[in-house]
Curated annotation (Swiss-Prot):
Annotated stretches, region: Disordered: 1-22
SUPFAM superfamilies tied to this protein: S15/NS1 RNA-binding domain
GO molecular function: rRNA binding; structural constituent of ribosome
Highest taxon listed in the record's lineage: Bacteria
Quaternary data: Part of the 30S ribosomal subunit. Forms a bridge to the 50S subunit in the 70S ribosome, contacting the 23S rRNA.
Task of the protein: One of the primary rRNA binding proteins, it binds directly to 16S rRNA where it helps nucleate assembly of the platform of the 30S subunit by binding and bridging several RNA helices of the 16S rRNA.
Protein name: Small ribosomal subunit protein uS15
Stored NCBIfam families: S15_bact
Range of residues in the leader sequence: none
Species assigned in the record: Xanthomonas campestris pv. campestris (strain ATCC 33913 / DSM 3586 / NCPPB 528 / LMG 568 / P 25)
Entry GO terms, CC: cytosolic small ribosomal subunit
One annotated GO biological process: translation
Length: 86
């Protein structure tokens, strides 16, 4: 059980060579966060991994704030695409 990095990049890239845009970074973090969330359903006392999860959530929040400040339309489309902010 791991994140299919290439598929996530393909689905969210802005150009042919894009691997580091905020959209791609947020999508990769979201995929890893969802994977870890499932892990915690069975391993409730895994506090070391929970710390890593919180760091990923904070990093994603920072990237989303940056994207919202720079380009609101890209932010809105990414939120819809990933299903965040219900």
């Amino acid at each position: 059980m791991s994140v299919d990095t290439q598929k996530v990049i393909e689905d969210n890239k802005r150009s042919a060579q894009d691997t580091g845009s905020p959209e791609v970074q947020v999508a990769l973090l979201t995929a890893r966060i969802e994977l870890l969330t499932g892990h915690f359903k069975t391993h409730k006392k895994d506090h070391h991994s929970r710390r890593g999860l919180l760091q990923m959530v904070n990093r994603r929040r920072s990237l989303l704030d940056y994207l919202k400040k720079k380009d609101g339309e890209r932010y809105k489309s990414l939120i819809e695409k990933l299903g965040l902010r219900r």
